UniProtKB/Swiss-Prot annotation:
It is found in: Cytoplasm; Membrane; Nucleus. The gene is Rgs3. The keyword DNA-binding does not apply. It comes from Rattus norvegicus (Rat). The modification Omega-N-methylarginine is found at R167. One of its GO terms (cellular component) is plasma membrane. This is Regulator of G-protein signaling 3.
Amino acid sequence: MNRFNGLCKVCSERRYRQITIRRGKDGFGFTICCDSPVRVQAVDSGGPAERAGLQQLDTVLQLNERPVEHWKCVELAHEIRSCPSEIILLVWRVVPQIKPGPDGGVLRRASCKSTHDLLSPPNKREKNCTHGAPTRPEQRHSCHLVCDSSDGLLLGGWERYTEVGKRSGQHTLPALSRATTPTDPNYIILAPLNPGSQLLRPVYQEDAIPEEPGTTTKGKSYTGLGKKSRLMKTVQTMKGHSNYQDCSALRPHIPHSSYGTYVTLAPKVLVFPVFVQPLDLCNPARTLLLSEELLLYEGRNKTSQVTLFAYSDLLLFTKEEEPGRCDVLRNPLYLQSVKLQEGSSEDLKFCVLYLAEKAECLFTLEAHSQEQKKRVCWCLSENIAKQQQLAATPTERKMFETEADEKEMPLVEGKGPGAEERTPSKDPSPSQELPPGQELPPSKDPSPSQELPPGQELPPSKDPSPSQELPPGQELPSSKNPSPSQELPAGQDLPPRKESFSGQEAAPGPESPSSEDIATCQNPPQSPETSTSKDSPPGQGSSPTTEVPSCQGLPAGQESTSQDPLLSQEPPAIPESSASDQNVLPSQESPPSQGSLSEKALAEQTISPGELPAATAGEPSASRPNFVIPEVRLDSAYSQQDGAHGGSSGEDEDAEEGEEGEEGEEDEEDDTNDDNYGDRNEAKRSSLIETGQGAEGGLSLRVQNSLRRRTHSEGSLLQEARGPCFASDTTLHCSDGEGTTSTWAIPSPRTLKKELGRNGGSMHHLSLFFTGHRKMSGTDLADDVEASRKRKSKNIAKDMKNKLAIFRRRNESPGAQPAGKADKTTKSFKPTSEEALKWSESLEKLLLHKYGLEVFQAFLRTEFSEENLEFWLACEDFKKVKSQSKMAAKAKKIFAEFIAIQACKEVNLDSYTREHTKENLQSITRGCFDLAQKRIFGLMEKDSYPRFLRSDLYLDLINQKKMSPPL
């Protein structure tokens, strides 16, 4: 075995053990923990693993000659379970070193230096550890196993740990009592030698230990805490933390516990019963913090000894039936949903509150000492606050998740000729404001919506873009929005959504770009090498298509204010009608906050026809953006000359608005008619647009048919209800398509609710919705209109009755007769005032009277507690059933409707009554609901019945006067 990791034969035989374990009747007899590598957590005493020689803390390197050093614990456990007869393990073992102690006894020290030694492979350990300066004696924590030299036996068979020179400023709770021995009073009895039994391990607060000022690493040369910390960690060491002890900056990530000097973090076997779902205790995000033995109060005077496992996110209540073997008593309590009540400082009791079945329950626990109570309460309160804080933050993180992802996306460097290679720089966020006087660094570019105050200087950029107007050092004008065309060099592309709008709208400042820039934008070159801008350096190509719209989005008002003679020649201008329809171009008077570019830029850009294909042809393939910006194109049938004149003059705009105002009344009248809405084909109310192929090969503007919706004015909704013939959403969608016939489909819920409200909710109109109707046209349509008018005149009274039906009180109990029939039957036995006075004697007399039962049920309905009386009546009917089969079915129905948790008509019963009734259903008799019926009857008698006697409903019956007989 000397071939492993270059060790000699003697060392490899001492460190590596090949163990063959045969399967017993209860498995292989050991448990594992941790990930990469997997370690032995515990070995059952007398089991197959212990007989084969496996020991606790052995690191598993191979399974059946397969390397498993980098496997997870769950994967290795599944592989071990699948082995039918035996397994062959190659393990790495911690070998103790024995040398004489100071008092003549035998002192055993482990040869492993730290937790890093246990986790890292043996051949890499010497390279990863860096020798630091030796620690001072007052900083050392020694850990010895001492034999008494007088009798040659271990004192009680226990290991002893000592702590020398603890820092005075360290905040820790009182430690366990020290053992009184004549030899050395500093030794503390903690852990037994038997690896299968419980180990009590000291866990120190490592963050509070000072370091040498010149050292930056903590290596294995430390003779103090670093050397002995392998026995001071829980066996569930977090994955990936093996290298953290080599760097002081990462030391706070080392898992540790600060809830006391000594805590019981022993590896124990947890047995999960069938009714408890097993947990992933090897999860690196779940750390065992405390393991304490406490008293759990099961009644007022009945207590039981339990072991509380406090993890970083949950609590486990277990009972240790055997040493090192804990049975889980109940489902785990997650810390984010529990509360802690510590009680008085003198009392050793404290409570853990949790929610179960919509009720607040609690566990009453009692510690054995004040120190234990302080330690446990400190741990629970701190981690409950952490978990509740983490549970409140995920929604906020999701809100900014997309923004954070976009900020991390680097800019793609351009590959065009003359573009300089440099690392992508992060741009400021679009909505970020810079204080006055602050200058941007040269490596960063301002985002388009970034607000720069007046007088702020723009530093020179490394690669000036072709459309930059300001020379280095020139101050910006008083406008708050800088020109978005100054953002990126020509060789770079834009990342999605963050700066895709950088050049799509011109700045609303008073200056207008020069004629050369406009000529460059309106006549883009066919290739990057043929033509360059005046401002661009030689050898650098023109900007890609993301910069082409920067000059196309100029408002018309800026062209007229410019004094450049070349601008008066009016090159092919942008038709203003496309911009006026959408109202998207920012004016000079609009504030920057209202004209934000971040959300509207993709849908608000306007491009004249024929410009984008040329720009696309001139775009280099290497600098093509990763996304496609949707373009808005005018239809081919639109007159470009009219659009050009309308875009250059403001009078035509006013005339156009006047025409729209004159047509507004006609449109509003047309909107009120649903029958001919599907025949119209205007794109006025489209919420989104889509591109389509025009008649001459160009792109055309078209409305998405699926987004068309009916829109009515408020006056049309208040008009008289129309007939049932109306077009649904699906009908409108089909009517837009060419060559398709409209078919009926189920309308939208909003339309269904609106039409049912208009027509009174009658069954005739309801049947028309779900059975369909035929498309009417011509003479059939006229006949149907005439017939519907006659039908309306006949059914006015019926419709009004249906509309006012919601104001009538209806009998909502299942199986009851309709409200109208109930009113007629109850009027026949309406009591006199003397009979009503007898109802106040007892609740039984009230329920025995038919009219009294109806009145009391109506009163309970006003208090939203009629389910109590319905349950009582159901139990009375259940007692009258004679057939055993019907009795069983009715009993299950009553339990599911009234008693089961979260039932539709759940009554207010305590848990004992609910469980007692559930047990009675195993053998159904007539009295299985007696206890629950008595509880509900008592509840009505003490609560609802006195309020009924004081209600106006009952007082009116008592004080009623003799009415004259009806005519």
